[in-house]
Amino acid sequence: MAENQEVYDVTIIGGGPIGLFTAFYCGMRELKTKVIEFLPKLGGKVSLFFPEKIIRDIGGIPGIAGKQLIEQLKEQAATFDPDIVLNQRVTGFERLDDGTIVLTGSEGKKHYTRTVILACGMGTLEVNEFDSEDAARYAGKNLHYGVEKLDAFKGKRVVISGGGDTAVDWANELEPIAASVTVVHRREEFGGMESSVTKMKQSSVRVLTPYRLEQLNGDEEGIKSVTVCHTESGQRKDIEIDELIINHGFKIDLGPMMEWGLEIEEGRVKADRHMRTNLPGVFVAGDAAFYESKLRLIAGGFTEGPTAVNSAKAYLDPKAENMAMYSTHHKKLVHK
């Protein structure tokens, strides 16, 4: 190994919710930790696309805005002062003769570590934009691929195109404050949580199925109406709007990690029940992980992160305890 290089016990790739909580738990296990995040700020997909979305599937928290959750996770992670690197994508992976792992960043910077925890979600995310020549001219006006501020839609006629969790959740969040909310989905069935779909259908939200968004009609100021088409009959309708939200999913790219020799299944990194990958010293947690009966919730990732940390600790020190002491007894936390 090159001399005078700082070597970390754990380097976490990804600074989203799971990466942040994993960094906290690394501190509980007294592991020297670095977090590398591709984006210019921490929080991952939650900060980027869902800062105002209310998250309700974390035990003990009836509901919390995405941005508030991230702020609390950042504060928690900072307890043990992990080093944070932003605006850097990890492109290279190399193992030296002494077992040290060298990660290369997008600008050529080398990061030396004894273990790696992949908490990078599904990799880099890019929204699936509406396939229309007009979409680009309306982006930044009244065409949106996410909701940054709920109040911006107050008293507006809103159309949401999509049928997954995000589309359903935004419909429910906006229904009390918008003048009207219309959801356009190309299938009869929705992909959201059953209770959320039921809530939407029992509210004032207008649901159009099976319809697809076909055309944007407007001028230099923005979209004035949209044309939707019935996927079976071909019947078309024009809907006057003030704001259009498109939730057509994401393009997912694990990027250079696909070349590291990791076992990949269904676009995710295959893990065992200890969150170990097929590469020694490399672990995974959160949406990046694949295993049987995987639970795709933040709450599930909050369990996987500590499991990965405990496995990393055992990898570094086979005589170590299986898990950290309870946080209520930790010397850095007992007076907080």
From Swiss-Prot:
GO process annotations (BP) = cell redox homeostasis; cellular response to iron ion
Q: Which cofactor does it need?
A: FAD
Q: Does the keyword Hydrolase apply?
A: no
Q: List the InterPro entries.
A: FAD/NAD-bd_sf (IPR036188), FAD/NAD-binding_dom (IPR023753), Fd--NADP_Rdtase_type_2 (IPR022890), Ferredoxin-NADP_redctase_2 (IPR050097)
Look at the named UniProt entry and state the broad enzyme category this protein falls under. oxidoreductase
Reaction(s) this enzyme catalyzes, per UniProt? 2 reduced [2Fe-2S]-[ferredoxin] + NADP(+) + H(+) = 2 oxidized [2Fe-2S]-[ferredoxin] + NADPH
The EC number on file is 1.18.1.2
Protein name according to UniProt = Ferredoxin--NADP reductase 1
Species for this entry: Bacillus subtilis (strain 168)
